[in-house]
């Protein structure tokens, strides 16, 4: 037995004789090595041992070194003696290829089998459930480790590729070279600027006359180089955020920052002392040459806030929406674009602001425009602030006009409308307006105030709603929605041209009750334009009601010269009856179907003033526009009237005019035939002057008669 045990891999085999002693031993027989199990008081056997061996070892350990072969349990001793030698049991079981194959097949279908599945598989393979469980656990660990090693290898390869690409890009940047300019483009630009300045100085020395006229276009071109440098953009963003906070406070705070006017107790005026205490801005530009204008107003408009915000960020859309105020606008530079929308956008813009009267000078300025969204409150903020905190004012403005933090806060409403709070805050150098009434009107802040901006915005939003509507009545002549849109676009171009003819006429502005005649070149000759401004002691609504009555105008021979007319198309532009577009057929009795004269008419009014504009149009061109053709090429010669109230309902304390008054501007154009010279002859000037004076006299007489009756 000993020889056989020694051959068994050189291991010592334990049996009942050499471990527990003989069965016939005396109960008092002591174990020769009583401390044999002492070193295994807390055995840490691996779980790979079979369950039967683990139980036997547990029993041995619980005996605390005493012999279990005492003879008191012969059945137990007999079982132990009959048990095969422990060394013959395989402690590590290697699965067969068939077992592994079947377990791998199940692993592909289900890597996490439940207890029943493992029990069924163990019976099928002749393994214990714990062996099956551990095999699946080890297999999952092995697969996870393989995937981890594979992913690490891929990441290392990708990292090496990125490092190589980065090194190549850096080396390419170091080798960049412009073949066109040879790295001398900035030097060349600096040299050209110096040359331009030198030429300007030469021209100014040769033409020192102070009366030399500089057109607005020239000034705009001179300011094109006033762009924001890269190192100044961070400062601009900080200023934008600060100005947005200032605008928010000016919109929210009432007294003592804003005091109610004593005349109507509704309009408010800015308390300059409180403003200086609350904000540091005026302390940095405290110049006595500048007069400050500040106003605030609220209104609900028929437009959603997103569309309105996008219009503020597009110079063309902005000038089109506010064309009675903004005669021209452009975006000079995009300093910052919003990350995910308009919010955070910062623009450098230029604008020329106007009142539709040649007696009121225009205002031009470069300024920064910033847009910010408060998503929690559903608000958008559009704030303008001057650029001259970074650059000198003389280099950025042409008429010493600065827009202090101004703009609007737009609150979205559930019905798609928007609640707009507008603040207009500017600094203007004193202008010498010849007429005292007009000077008081401008200095009151009403001419360019917040109420005028909101009045124009409300009317333009109603016009846009009419443009998009499909249920507007048009007397049944306009065949389609597209035809109505084309007619409205043609009419809008007519009104804008009329306003530009009044504002952009060169030379000194006319005085009150005088006629100014200018001309402009067109293909084939000159078009004389006569402008007259008259102060009427009547409210602008009275004058507007008279002028929009075409029957009265025909009787007074003001516009139609006594001719009969018929309205063939009518488009309502808003809730007010005075906001409409009409297509009139002139000389109905004498016209045949082959000889039709048409006149396009648009009238618009709000609290800030009224416009009545007319122009004859070619019937063939109108028909093409009705059929969907582009109306932008149809020639127009607009004539009409502009009525501006010089003392609005809120009034101005200390005004020299106590009764309602308004400025009536009459502008007419005549297409001169076969006029090829650059100057108008005296006969043409005399005819135009007589016609416009007669028109003003008839209007004045009609108003006197209406008041007398």
UniProtKB/Swiss-Prot annotation:
SUPFAM superfamilies: Bet v1-like, Homeodomain-like. Residues 88-147 bind DNA. Keywords: Coiled coil, DNA-binding, Homeobox, Nucleus, Transcription, Transcription regulation. Residues 137-205 form a coiled coil. GO terms for molecular function: DNA binding; DNA-binding transcription factor activity; DNA-binding transcription factor activity, RNA polymerase II-specific; lipid binding. Residues 61-92 are annotated as: Disordered. Pfam families: Homeodomain, START. Probable transcription factor. Belongs to the HD-ZIP homeobox family. Class IV subfamily. This is Homeobox-leucine zipper protein HDG4.
């Amino acid at each position: 037995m000993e020889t056989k045990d020694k051959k068994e891999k050189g291991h010592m085999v334990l049996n009942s004789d050499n471990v527990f002693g003989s069965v016939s031993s005396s109960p008092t027989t002591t174990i020769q090595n009583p401390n044999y199990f002492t070193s295994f008081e807390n055995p840490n056997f691996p779980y790979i041992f079979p369950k039967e061996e683990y139980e036997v070892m547990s029993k041995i350990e619980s005996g605390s070194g005493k012999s279990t072969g005492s003879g008191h349990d012969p059945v137990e001793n007999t079982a132990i003696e009959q048990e095969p030698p422990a060394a013959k049991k395989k402690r590590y079981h290697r699965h067969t290829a068939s077992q592994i194959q079947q377990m791998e097949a199940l692993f592909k279908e289900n890597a996490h089998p439940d207890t029943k599945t493992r029990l069924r598989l163990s019976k099928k393979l002749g393994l214990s459930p714990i062996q099956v469980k551990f095999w699946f656990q080890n297999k999952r660990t092995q697969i996870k480790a393989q995937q981890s090693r594979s992913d690490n290898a891929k990441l290392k390869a990708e990292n090496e590729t990125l490092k190589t690409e980065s090194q190549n890009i850096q080396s390419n940047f170091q080798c960049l070279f412009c073949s066109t300019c040879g790295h001398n483009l900035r030097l060349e630009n600096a040299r050209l600027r110096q040359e331009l300045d030198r030429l300007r100085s030469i021209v100014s020395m040769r033409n020192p006359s102070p009366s030399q006229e500089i057109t607005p276009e020239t000034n705009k071109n001179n300011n094109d180089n006033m762009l924001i440098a890269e190192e100044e953009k961070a400062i601009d963003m900080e200023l934008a955020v600060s100005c947005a906070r200032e605008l928010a406070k000016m919109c929210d705070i009432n007294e003592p920052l804003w005091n109610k006017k004593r005349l109507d107790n509704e309009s408010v005026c800015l308390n300059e002392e409180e403003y200086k205490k609350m904000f540091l801005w005026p302390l940095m530009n405290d110049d006595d040459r500048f007069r400050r204008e500040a106003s605030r107003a609220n209104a609900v408009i028929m437009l959603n806030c997103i569309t309105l915000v996008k219009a503020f960020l597009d110079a063309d859309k902005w000038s089109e929406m506010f064309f009675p105020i903004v005669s021209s606008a452009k975006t000079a530079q995009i300093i910052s674009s919003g990350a995910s929308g308009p919010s955070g956008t910062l623009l450098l813009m230029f604008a020329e602001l106007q009142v539709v009267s040649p007696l009121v000078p225009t205002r031009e300025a470069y300024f920064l425009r910033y847009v910010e969204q408060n998503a929690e409150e559903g608000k958008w903020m559009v704030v303008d602030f001057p650029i001259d905190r970074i650059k000198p004012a003389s280099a950025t403005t042409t008429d010493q006009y600065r827009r202090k933090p101004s703009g609007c806060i737009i609150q979205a409403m559930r019905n798609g409308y928007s609640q707009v709070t507008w603040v207009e805050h500017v600094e203007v150098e004193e202008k010498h307006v010849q007429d005292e009434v007009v000077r008081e009107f401008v200095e009151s802040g009403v001419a360019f105030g917040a109420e005028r901006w909101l009045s124009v915005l409300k009317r333009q939003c109603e016009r846009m709603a009419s443009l998009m509507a499909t249920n507007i009545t048009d007397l049944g002549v306009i065949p389609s929605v597209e035809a109505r849109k084309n007619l409205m676009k043609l009419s809008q171009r007519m009104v804008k041209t009329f306003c530009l003819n009044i504002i952009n006429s060169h030379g000194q502005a006319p005085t009150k009750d005088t006629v100014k005649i200018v001309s402009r070149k067109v293909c084939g000759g000159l078009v004389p334009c006569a402008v007259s401004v008259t102060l009427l002691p009547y409210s602008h609504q009275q004058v507007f009601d008279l002028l929009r009555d075409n029957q009265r105008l025909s009787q007074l021979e003001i516009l139609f010269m006594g001719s009969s007319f018929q309205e063939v198309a009518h488009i309502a532009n808003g809730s007010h009856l005075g906001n409409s577009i009409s297509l009139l057929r002139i000389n109905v009795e004498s016209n045949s179907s082959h000889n039709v004269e048409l006149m396009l008419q648009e009238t618009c009014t709000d609290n800030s003033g009224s416009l009545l504009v007319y122009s004859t149009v070619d019937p063939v061109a109108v028909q093409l526009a009705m059929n969907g053709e582009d109306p932008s090429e149809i020639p127009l010669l607009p004539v009409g009237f502009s009525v501006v109230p010089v003392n609005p309902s809120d009034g101005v304390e200390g005004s020299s005019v106590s009764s309602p008054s308004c400025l009536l501007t009459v502008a007419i154009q005549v297409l001169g035939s076969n006029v090829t010279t650059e100057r108008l002859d005296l006969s043409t000037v005399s005819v135009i002057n007589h016609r416009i004076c007669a028109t003003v006299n008839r209007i004045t007489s009609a108003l006197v008669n209406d008041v007398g009756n």
